[in-house]
Amino acid sequence: MILVINSGSSSIKFKLFDTSKAIEPILDGLAERIGIDGFLKFEHNNQKYKFEDPLPDHEHAIQLILNKLLELKIISNIDEIKGVGFRVVHGGEISHSSIINEEVLQKIQESVKLAPLHNPAAIIAIKAVKKLMPNTSMIACFDTAFHQTMPQVNYLYSVPYKWYEEFGVRKYGFHGISYEYIVNKCEEILNKKKEHLNLIVCHLGNGASISCIKDGKSYDTSMGLTPLAGLMMGTRSGDIDVSICEYVAKQTNSDIFAITQILNKQSGLLGLSQTSADMRDVLEQYDRNDKKAIIAVEKYVQVVADFIVKYANYLDSIDAVVFTAGIGENADVIRDLICKRVKLLGLQIDQEKNESKYSDYKLISSEKSKIPVYAIRTNEEKMICLDTLNLIK
C-alpha cells in the first residue's frame, strides 16, 4: 500500500492506495484545523468516519491517522504501507520526484523562500512521518519538477541576469503533478507515445495555469516564480503591470507586501466580480446579467484564450487541447466561451458532448473541429502514488 499526503499549514489531505491490483484509493481523508480544534474524517468502503481531536500539531494528526487505520483493521500493521508520497509545491530546480534523504530535504528547505506558505507544511509532515514510520520509504513529488524541461528563453525573465544567479529569479511553473498525469492520460486516450505528444493543457481550478506540452514535455507555462503569475484566477490577479504595486502602495500608504497580499487574496474573479472567488457563484450572477460578473467572466475567458493562441504558435501541430481541474472539468459554459474566443485554431465544440456527464474523460469537440478538445479529470494523488511506487521498487 502507498499513503499519499498533501500537507497544508493547518490540514493534511491523505489517500491510501492499494497497489496489489489496480492502483485505486481505498481510503480518502482529511485532518483539519490542526493546532486549533481539530478533527479527522475519512471514507472507506462507502462508510464515513469522523473523529473529534484537538490535533495540536501535524505529528499528532499523522499518528491519529495511523492509529485509526490499525483500529479499524484497514491495515494490520504499519509495515503494510510500503511508501509515503508527499506533494511538495516547490522543488526549485529539482527535475523529478525524489526519494527523500537529507540532501533532498535540504533542497526543500532552501525553496521555502520561494513557497513560504506551502513548503514549511510539507517539511513538518515529512519529519513527522520519518519519526513515526522510520523504516518506510518517503518520496517527494514536486509541482515544479515537470516544468524543468522548459528552455531558458521561456523560463528567464528580462531582468538583470544576476537576479537568476544570486536569487533564483526565474519562471518555475506549478501544477506539474497534474500536467504529468494529463500527459500520461493523453498517451492512453490518443494512442500515441507521449514523447510525440503536442498538447495545450488548461488546468483551471481556483488556482489556474496553462502549459504548452511539446513532445510530451513542458515547453512553457503561465505561472512564474510564484503561482501569482499568468491567468486570472479565483483570488489571484495573474499577469499585471508590476508598477501597479508601487503606484497603489503610494496611493494607500501601504507597503509592497500588503499590495502583494491583495493581488493574491482579493483579486481575480473575486476582485472583478465583487461577488465570489468561486466560478459557480460568479456564473450565477453572470446568468442574471450582473455587469461585474459579466466582465469578470469575459476577462477570465479572454486571458485563457490568449494563452492558448500564444502556445499554439510554439507547436508545429497540436494533438489536443485539454481542460482539467475544477473549472476545466466541470464548467461547460467556460469551456465553450474559451473555445469560441480562440478563433485562429478552428476549435468547434459539440454542445451535447460538452454538457454531458462523464466519469474519467470525454471528447467535447465536434467532427468539424480542426483540433480535438477534451475534458479530462486530473488525479494528482494517483500520479504521486505511481511515482512513489516506481521509486521504491
Swiss-Prot record:
Assembly mode: Homodimer.
Any one Gene Ontology cellular component term annotated for this protein: cytoplasm
Residues at the site labelled Transition state stabilizer: H175, R236
InterPro entries: Ac/propionate_kinase, Aliphatic_acid_kin_short-chain, Aliphatic_acid_kinase_CS, ATPase_NBD
UniProt xrefs under PROSITE patterns: ACETATE_KINASE_1, ACETATE_KINASE_2
Protein name, entry field: Acetate kinase
Keyword ATP-binding on entry: yes
GO molecular function: acetate kinase activity; ATP binding; magnesium ion binding
Family named by the database record: Belongs to the acetokinase family.
Pathway: Metabolic intermediate biosynthesis; acetyl-CoA biosynthesis; acetyl-CoA from acetate: step 1/2
UniProt subcellular location: Cytoplasm
Cofactor binding summary note: Mg(2+). Can also accept Mn(2+).
Binding-site positions, Mg(2+): N6, E380
Keywords per UniProt: ATP-binding, Cytoplasm, Kinase, Magnesium, Metal-binding, Nucleotide-binding, Transferase
Binding-site residues, substrate: R87
EC number(s) stated in the UniProt entry for this protein: 2.7.2.1
Residues annotated for ATP binding in this entry: K13, H203, L204, G205, N206, G207, D278, M279, R280, G326, I327, G328, E329, N330
Catalytic reaction(s) noted: acetate + ATP = acetyl phosphate + ADP
Gene3D superfamilies named in the record: 3.30.420.40
Gene: ackA
Function recorded in the entry: Catalyzes the formation of acetyl phosphate from acetate and ATP. Can also catalyze the reverse reaction.
CDD domains: ASKHA_NBD_AcK_PK (cd24010)
Phylogenetic lineage: Bacteria, Bacillati, Mycoplasmatota, Mollicutes, Mycoplasmataceae
Entry's Gene Ontology BP terms: acetate metabolic process; acetyl-CoA biosynthetic process
Transmembrane residue ranges: none
Cofactor: Mg(2+); Mn(2+)
SUPFAM superfamilies tied to this protein: Actin-like ATPase domain
